[in-house]
């Protein structure tokens, strides 16, 4: 079995590669590198800092935050007033895409600089293999102290996900020292009249001792992340620079922004109505599958509630950075703000962020704050979130592993003509499994497919494993409402061919013979994932007693 030889160097554990592709893949990758060399003449190389002058790194992920709902990116509602002001001293990337539309593959790609088809971490295999060297391992190896706080159980719950490779300490809102405070925070967010999700019933069960851990803890990341980070910074070795990664889940469903944030965006009448729209998982899946409807007012109230959650995140970021600055921890610190993916909010008759590679789930915020290292301003050239892997290493003066290769590029010199690729490599099963028993005769096959997309300039081609493809002109149709594949067959054929050639350059992995699926998680981890819709609650109709 050949050793690992992609962007992340092998750690002595052989990686499962697909035999028979090596020569073709190598030639394709060589051709891609030649094109890259020809277009990188304007590359800016900052002076590599010495070991004693390496910057700190604070990397914040707003889980499920889509770029076009931030006023920083031109949105009509003022959802991010602090971020808009703070980012005036940062580089704002106006056209940043994630490599995938959900947590597992997108985080694994940011951590390794690899595409999902190269690391094989997805809905069918929830574990990031030890064979891949993560960015945290590289920072730790360069003398950094490393910390991770995540409200997303997939990222924080080891050994299941294995995302904490290279992390000195990993914490989460259900850590024993924070669990009680997390429940208090979440209960304070909920109103007695809230009928929008399953969360009030879950918290009631937690109060009565019928569940050991509450799904609601994931919604308390903001306040606790600040406390946990400050405590760790004060207790760890201050002689070493730090690498801190934080994941916030306030914008992930269930949406429970406190009333004060709803009141800043909605009329009193709409604030009251926002608590009454049924956004339980069953209802949202049925809507996505075309089995039920929301009226236009319900969709708009869903969007407004999501926007209020973004406003809450903005306030939490202000509090986090203020606390770190007051404690003296922002001196010579690079700050990254991005998202792992976005959210469907009624577009294409979809909610949540599964079964999709549309812009609503791929286009995310990306802000890089590094005064003295990166020039402030807006950057319009196309980039991707896994570009953070080589960029942060470069800014810290840390060398990439010998022999590594990757399609991830430095954010310090974006390419105007860059071709971008994203994918949904494994069919999400949870929605189908939850809905099918309640709808005998329903055919879920249109949703049982893998998706890939290639974007060249304004043209976006979507490939479906079931033979249903799509073509959009993002300049004229940014919301992807008009499929042009029948109108422009020649362009569609060209982009399909380009996608095939691009996909051939990937150092594709093979799924493990015994993948780590969610059935192997502990009961506590499964309980948390139920709150995110990642694990089925039960198959009875929640509308019936």
Report residues per predicted region.
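Bacterial N-terminal signal peptides that target proteins for export
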Residues: 4-27
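Bacterial N-terminal signal peptides
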Residues: 26-37
